[in-house]
């Protein structure tokens, strides 16, 4: 709320002027709760939870507009295209949620949109193929028909927001999903935090899903365009209807026109995809574990992740095509849809695993000049589903576009930092993620000047101590650790036959990090100082096919942190069982979340980064489109390769070792029918590792297997230092200057800055509190990094204070400033308790 600083001594006595200003702030909150005509309240640079909440998780007979403080209703937005060939532009269903004050016209609300194809339901993931669904497997389709544009509908009448909300049924958004065993829309309550702070929330599953028309096309321009159309409706530039048949128009007369998109995974993907269209009104995006280019979700440098059907675009389309659950609806489209899926499969595999036009229309990085939004990009550094390359591709594109972009990199896996469905969230230096997101959206959607754009470019959680977060002024690093492979043999050959090499698939990473074998090459280098890796790692080598047939000969490279003794490190991104109850404040009459911490494990190895390339794609670079061309590998014919390992931000401790490992295929993702062998020129192998510390070069010595008794007796081979190849090097964009870390304020801010309130329009003429005033990125455990990391001394001395915002429950403190605050807020707390029964 901004009553005091987080670092305040709660035992000191309060002065009369301080008390008066605290009372003034408390009264603003008190009055906002009771105002007959409500509008968002902004204190301390954040929207405050002054709107009451009621759930939408009810049966039709129990849900009534009159009893609802959050009103809900469906709309059906008309798109541009007729993908299902029924002669009409497709309609996409969207569920709108608003504070009742917004529906009644008290103020115009900013909108959060989650475009998530899973949200209307899914099919059984174990039976998602044409065969298992009883659909034909031999059809074809004219893909140009997907872009047909018949004439638009003509409205016959219109309905107001309140009229639509009064007619709405809970079953429009709360119904049982027979294959998921949950109720959809499952994100119904994921954004309650923002609803009680005066935002509107819209959820849509898009084309081809239950309640909508059209075909799901797995990330294509058609899918993205349909979600873009929802934003255009919010901006008054497109029509929507109250249902699919009556042609009764409904306008977003409640909307300010300012929209943010956020969501995890596919919903994180659509945020970036829609932003790449340049649609007007989309002010900011917060993609979490989103896909930047679908080619790099299913493939890497000419080789695939996984086997069919899970490596097929069509699998995801079938999985979310819940129009099948409505038999009458499905009866009219199944033939065309199955033909479309057959054609999609043919088109995807017509170019093997190379980049093609199928992937081009699902690559959102191609035109960065269209990006006109700010972005807070969120990604788990242990995410093996949507790999970390995607956040870097997004970051690069947004930087090239000159947009304000920040990275929030946590140690989790494929998870949103506020995991509503799991009942917990994470904090960074004491600030929960929703508090950060509140600050971000308050600035970009309501125009409050809270200096959020001055946040550090990168905030990253430490890999060995998750309580620590480091801040960096940019993502790119100009320093490199060069590892030059050193071996007594100029050539080494490995096989795809892991079994013969004595490698168990379950323990492969641990085994190959220790020594070479018939199935892997391992080179090890000592770490002589703490070294922080920041970015993607390039590994150059020269290799040739030694044995095999076909065109898919995957090479999997690993960089591994290895030590003789166990060390602490975050494992696979799972959280501890013990969580801090109620530590993640929600506000209003919402239940708080628990605060979770990522679990560390004791281990002797941790894979830092992985990369995959096909021997058939020597010209493949980092960007997806560079993987268009391939060759027919010939036995004994050498080519130069550069494999790009996934980006990471990872600190390796002094005394550890870095193991650079080469395998054939990655058995965690793929199986191969025919064995193959690959020969490497060992003196060609070099890794260029981006680091925070100064550039240095080291040798990485070949580690023979225990059975390779001849190796010790071989003479040493002197190899020259390898010059990094220029074939794939691309000029980096120039970072804007300056990018700097915001240091914490040592003094209390002026209260007339700290306690700005009222509407966004009123706020804009004042300077409200800076980022460093409230819960902030810097504490006694954080690091601010420019080139070399350095510990930042916080203004907070001794034990860290509680969160700035009110918490559920209380702690005993000496009567003083904290006691005065409690007294001034007691009437507000009592009133909020009374409203919990609403």
Functional labels for PLM-detected ranges:
Residues 384-391:
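Conserved alpha/beta-hydrolase "acid-adjacent" motif
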Residues 698-700, 705-818, 836-838:
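Intrinsically disordered, low-complexity repeat and linker tracts
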Residues 1-51, 60-63, 117, 121-192, ...:
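Accessory cap/linker subdomain of secreted extracellular hydrolases
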Residues 825-838:
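C-terminal membrane-anchoring or membrane-association module
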Residues 82-89:
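Acidic, glycine-anchored loop motifs typical of Ca2+
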Residues 371, 377-379, 383:
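Short beta-strand/loop motif that positions the catalytic acidic residue
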Residues 451-744:
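Glycine/threonine-rich phosphate-binding loop and adjacent beta-strand/alpha-helix elements that clamp
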Residues 107-117, 658:
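Short beta-strand element of the alpha/beta-hydrolase
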């Amino acid at each position: 709320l901004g009553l005091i600083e987080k670092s305040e001594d709660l035992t000191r006595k309060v002065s009369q002027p301080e008390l008066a200003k605290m009372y003034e702030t408390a009264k603003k909150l008190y009055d906002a709760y009771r105002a007959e005509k409500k509008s968002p309240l902004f204190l301390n640079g954040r929207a405050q939870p002054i709107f009451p909440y009621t759930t939408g998780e009810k049966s039709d007979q129990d849900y009534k507009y009159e009893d609802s403080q959050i009103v809900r209703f469906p709309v059906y937005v008309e798109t541009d295209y007729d993908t299902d060939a029924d002669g009409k532009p497709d309609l996409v269903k969207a569920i709108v949620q608003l504070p009742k004050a917004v529906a009644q016209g008290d103020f115009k609300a900013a909108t959060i949109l989650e475009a998530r194809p899973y949200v209307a339901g899914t099919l059984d993931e174990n039976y998602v193929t044409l065969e298992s669904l009883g659909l034909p497997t031999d059809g074809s389709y004219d893909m140009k028909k997907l872009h047909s544009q018949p004439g638009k509908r003509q409205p016959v009448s219109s309905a107001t927001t309140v009229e639509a909300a009064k007619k709405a049924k809970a079953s429009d958004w709360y119904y049982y999903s027979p294959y998921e065993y949950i109720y959809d829309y499952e994100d119904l309550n994921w954004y309650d935090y923002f609803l009680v702070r005066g935002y509107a929330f819209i959820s849509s599953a898009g084309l081809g899903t239950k309640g909508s028309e059209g075909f799901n096309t797995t990330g294509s321009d058609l899918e993205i365009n349909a979600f873009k159309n929802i934003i255009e409706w919010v901006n008054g530039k497109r029509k929507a209807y109250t249902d699919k048949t009556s042609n009764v128009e409904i306008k977003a007369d409640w909307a300010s026109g300012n929209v943010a998109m956020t969501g995890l995974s596919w919903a994180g993907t659509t945020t970036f995809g829609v932003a790449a269209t340049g649609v007007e009104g989309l002010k900011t995006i917060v993609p979490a574990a989103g896909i930047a280019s679908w080619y790099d979700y299913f493939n890497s440098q000419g080789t695939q992740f996984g086997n069919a059907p899970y490596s097929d675009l069509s699998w995801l389309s079938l999985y979310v095509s819940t129009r099948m659950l409505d038999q009458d609806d499905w009866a009219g489209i199944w033939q065309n849809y199955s033909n479309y899926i057959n054609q999609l499969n043919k088109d995807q595999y017509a170019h093997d695993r190379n980049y093609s036009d199928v992937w081009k229309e699902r690559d959102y990085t191609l035109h960065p000049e269209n990006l006109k939004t700010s972005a807070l990009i969120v990604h788990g550094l242990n995410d093996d589903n949507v790999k970390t390359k995607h956040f870097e591709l997004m970051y690069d594109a947004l930087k090239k576009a000159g947009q304000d972009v920040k990275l929030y990199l946590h140690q989790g896996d494929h998870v949103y930092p506020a995991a509503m469905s799991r009942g917990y969230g994470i904090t960074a230096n004491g600030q929960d993620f929703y508090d950060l997101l509140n600050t971000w959206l308050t600035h970009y959607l309501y125009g409050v000047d809270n200096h959020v754009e001055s946040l550090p470019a990168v905030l990253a959680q430490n890999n060995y101590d998750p309580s620590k977060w480091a801040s960096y002024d940019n993502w790119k690093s100009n320093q490199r650790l060069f590892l030059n492979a050193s071996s007594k043999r100029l050539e080494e050959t490995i096989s795809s036959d892991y079994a013969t090499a004595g490698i168990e698939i379950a323990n492969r990473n641990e085994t190959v990090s220790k020594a070479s074998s018939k199935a892997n090459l391992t080179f090890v280098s000592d770490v002589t100082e703490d070294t922080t890796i920041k970015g993607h790692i390039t590994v150059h080598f020269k290799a040739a096919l030694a044995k095999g047939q076909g065109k898919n000969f995957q090479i999997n490279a690993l960089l591994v942190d290895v030590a003789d003794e166990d060390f602490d490190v975050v494992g696979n991104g799972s959280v501890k069982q013990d969580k801090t109850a109620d530590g993640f404040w929600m506000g209003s009459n919402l239940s708080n979340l628990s605060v979770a911490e990522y679990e560390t494990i004791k281990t002797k190895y941790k894979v830092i980064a992985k990369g995959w390339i096909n021997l058939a794609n020597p010209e493949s670079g980092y960007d997806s489109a560079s993987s268009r061309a391939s060759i027919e590998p010939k036995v004994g014919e050498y080519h130069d390769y550069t494999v790009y390992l996934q980006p990471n931000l990872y600190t390796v401790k002094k005394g550890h070792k870095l193991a650079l490992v080469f395998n054939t295929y990655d058995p965690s993702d793929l199986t191969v029918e025919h064995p193959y062998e690959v020969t490497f020129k060992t003196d060609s192998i070099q890794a260029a590792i981006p680091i925070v510390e100064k550039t240095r070069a080291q040798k990485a010595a070949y580690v023979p297997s225990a059975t390779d008794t001849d190796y010790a007796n071989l003479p040493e081979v002197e190899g020259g230092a390898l010059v990094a190849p220029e074939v794939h090097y691309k000029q980096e964009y120039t970072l804007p200057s300056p990018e700097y870390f915001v240091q914490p304020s040592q003094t209390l801010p002026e209260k007339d800055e700290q306690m700005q309130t009222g509407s966004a329009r009123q706020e804009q003429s004042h300077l409200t509190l800076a980022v460093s005033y409230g819960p902030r990125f810097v504490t006694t455990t954080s690091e601010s990094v420019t080139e070399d990391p350095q510990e930042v001394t916080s203004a907070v001395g001794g034990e860290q204070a509680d969160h700035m915002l009110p918490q559920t429950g209380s702690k005993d403190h000496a009567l003083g400033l904290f006691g005065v605050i409690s007294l001034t807020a007691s009437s507000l707390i009592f009133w909020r308790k009374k409203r919990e029964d609403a």
